[in-house]
């Protein structure tokens, strides 16, 4: 009964308001729900259910799901049914079903976590190889029902890989440079606050439920940049409570570790992995954790990267470091995921060393270590060689590890891809990675087969998704971004799944069965990654974001001239990294022969990776016949134009989605449309300034509808030179003369009488909440505040730059000829009410 009450409490939240908390598990009524009643079960029969375990959870999930979707109450029968024709759902393990006298001869072979689902009218059989598998099968059955799929079926489903984990980059404390959740845009940590585990772990239980519903099986609950205090007695007790919250859903808990903990926490004078005291210390800590959490999944370790300690301090190898933890885990059956994200961020020198290349680091550090890792070590490899860019080639390290299992690290949180403020559906990108054939030894070597263990006959391997949910009821900060979490889980289970089919499953369960709703969200989502790539970074140049600050707004110059290694090597004549063997960094040579030959040769390198592998003049012709620079111009205009269509598309389904979620999504799509223009102008102006080559279409730098703020009549405002220059339309904006007096910028309008859209581009810094008022003559058109830092969840910035640039548009404004437009800016805190420009746009025109 306790399980039932808890689950009902969790599900009941969605009935109060459609705030996103239930995500795709709303169990909302489907069209014509009552007409299905005769084909639905009336009884739930859980086999060998124990309170707080997955079979028990499955039973109550079925009760709530069938009631929510169809309005039909079903009863729970806690003993084996004696009538095989009874309209019942029987749920349990294969073993329990056989022990109860069931016929398992027709059940296909199942592996750990696999399940068998048989639906014959109202008689349903859900069997798992283990309890977790039975729960997965239950969720699959309910998700079919939630999509209106009630027809008879019979099939088995096995996971593609044993490791289907989530990484949460949650910090024990808020503050610092990365807040409560590093690269998290959905609010504070659901696990930690003020240096300890939260008292209320309701959201942890809800999270486990979501993850189990898509076939995931473990969560690393703390940041890879780990704080050693996660291992204090109080916090080990606390993480045991998190594990308790996860356990009803079959989700296991794992921890990120700080390599130097024996010294920084344990009081030793060393953290050398060969020192017997260090070995004993880790063994004792691991024993203590398993006493508290007998089903703990294992550890995640980031070592010798971006300031994190590791074995290099003592001239030990990465294998030595990984094996330290692996051996401590072996008596308990645990696994260590050891990150391949290892590079020197302090000494890489772009200017002095043409062959220096961060993309080479993983292979250079791990090559030759393959036979040395313990069997319970899995190398966790980012999908690309750099860092979750809008497009990268597959990491070559997957081809270098045959005796050691590997897992692909994918990023659900959109660190470089719009931080959930821009719609970017990531499944098509991930599919390109998982379907890529590395041709190891001239044989089929698809990435998904490598990480599953099939290609090299490894028993371990799989997936690690960096998700970073928070306390926001949308989980990720955006309702639409949750499609990425859903797709991640589904692809980890079955990498052959289709991106569109996954998306449409999610839409029906999250929003509506209405075909127009399905079509609109499908169109927007499937166009979103190409659009973002077009207006952020093309041809493999990487996401041209500000890599030195929040990884959010445009700042292409920040890529170069520093040791972070995300270089473009752009100068006045040419652009791109030469990663060839014959003349460059040799990165192409890290790939197996067939792939190496493709990337080494500029003629066979795909255009979308041209600048990743080759340094070329701006006038280099692509396979399309366009020059590189003209492609940049065209792509940025095309991508930003696509983003404008998302707003109008979304508006067509108004009234078909609840108001709360409709308005929340609309706000972000309007913001994205404006910020896409900021991206477009910043990148095109930057490369026009650098190359001196004009846009053949005459668009770049030519904005006839704009009025630059610095050209207006100013009272209490003054011009300000923006850095980087391309972040402002004319390199300048205006700011109030001081932080206590309002400013006014005015200009007569030279337009004909009529209706126009008035767009104002401004900067919303995270150091105050300025207010702006827009007037036509003495009439107030509109007012807004600089409070996006409280709404969007993106990385905050105190600067006037591409991260804080924003746009507001007032539609269908009647303007009389010779009217005077004025903007009054009222500063707040340290924010001086900055304005970039105003556009007076004929209706339907985007400048």
Curated annotation (Swiss-Prot):
Recorded GO CC terms: extracellular region
GO molecular function (one): alpha-glucuronidase activity
Temperature note: Optimum temperature is 30 degrees Celsius.
Signal peptide: 1-22
Main EC class the enzyme belongs to: hydrolase
GO biological process, one term: xylan catabolic process
Glycan attachment sites: 48, 78, 227, 315, 349, 457, 472, 534, 583, 689, 738-739, 769
Family: Belongs to the glycosyl hydrolase 67 family.
Designated name of the protein: Alpha-glucuronidase A
Encoding gene per record: aguA
